[in-house]
């Protein structure tokens, strides 16, 4: 417990120093359902994202680069995943399983985490995390070029949120960016739950 308290204290001091050195502004996208403290204005790019099971779904990347590093929020939209997997099932038949449409979505956090691990040279932190009782994962890694990545990944209603701050090794950890994500509804109100809503991970699933 003493070691944990030291980590928390050190993190708090880091965050304070970093907040002073860098101007943070709130950014919200009701369309994509999130709000976060950003280090500057985001550039927005729409991309095609190939899932672990090989289908292509739309994603939107919000990114900002400055002299401290690159900061991005990637929102991957898996909401049409089941339909795309059903189309593949009709093409392949018995060689393909109907459940893959749900598995692809439920495994998306682990898949995104693996991609971050694969590009790292060392991993300093790699564990479960949650925000507003929505399950996720956090990682802190060092890359071959000595930059450090502070990442957080969450899945909510078939949308995957990948928070990635890859920064210079000589600045304080950008924890403000990694840990300030909030989920919002179409009116911009913050979404919170009293319990863990497992059924809200994958949208459109028929309950039995």
Regions found by a protein language model. Name each.
Residues 81-82, 86-90, 155, 159-160, ...:
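An acidic-aromatic pocket/loop used at catalytic or ligand-binding sites
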Residues 20-58, 122-123, 131-133, 184, ...:
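N-terminal "mature-domain start" segment
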Residues 42, 96-116, 157-208:
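Surface-exposed amphipathic alpha-helical segments
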Residues 7-16:
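Bacterial N-terminal signal peptides
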Residues 48-149:
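Conserved polar/disulfide-associated segments of primarily extracytoplasmic proteins
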Residues 1-8, 42:
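Bacterial N-terminal signal peptides that target proteins for export
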Residues 37-41, 66-68, 134, 154-161:
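Short, solvent-exposed coil/turn segments at beta-strand boundaries
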Residues 54-56, 153, 175:
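Short glycine/proline-enriched turns and hinge-like loops at secondary-structure junctions
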């Amino acid at each position: 417990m003493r070691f944990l308290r030291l980590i928390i204290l050190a993190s708090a001091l880091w965050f304070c120093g970093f907040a002073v050195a860098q101007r943070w502004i709130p950014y919200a996208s009701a369309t994509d359902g999130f709000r976060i403290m950003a280090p500057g204005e985001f550039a927005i790019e729409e991309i095609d994202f190939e899932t672990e099971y090989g289908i292509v779904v739309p994603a939107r990347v919000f990114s900002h680069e400055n002299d401290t590093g690159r900061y991005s929020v990637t929102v991957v939209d898996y909401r049409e995943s089941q339909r795309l997997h059903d189309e593949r099932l009709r093409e392949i038949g018995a060689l393909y399983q109907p459940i893959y449409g749900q598995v692809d979505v439920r495994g998306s956090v682990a898949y995104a985490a693996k991609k971050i691990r694969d590009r790292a040279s060392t991993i300093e932190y790699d564990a479960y995390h949650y925000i507003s009782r929505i399950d996720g994962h956090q990682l802190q890694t060092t890359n071959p070029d000595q930059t450090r990545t502070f990442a957080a990944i969450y899945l909510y209603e078939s949308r995957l949120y990948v928070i990635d701050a890859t920064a210079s090794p000589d600045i304080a950890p950008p924890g403000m960016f990694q840990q300030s994500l909030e989920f919002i509804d179409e009116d911009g109100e913050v979404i919170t739950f009293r319990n863990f809503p497992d059924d809200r991970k994958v949208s459109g699933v028929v309950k039995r």
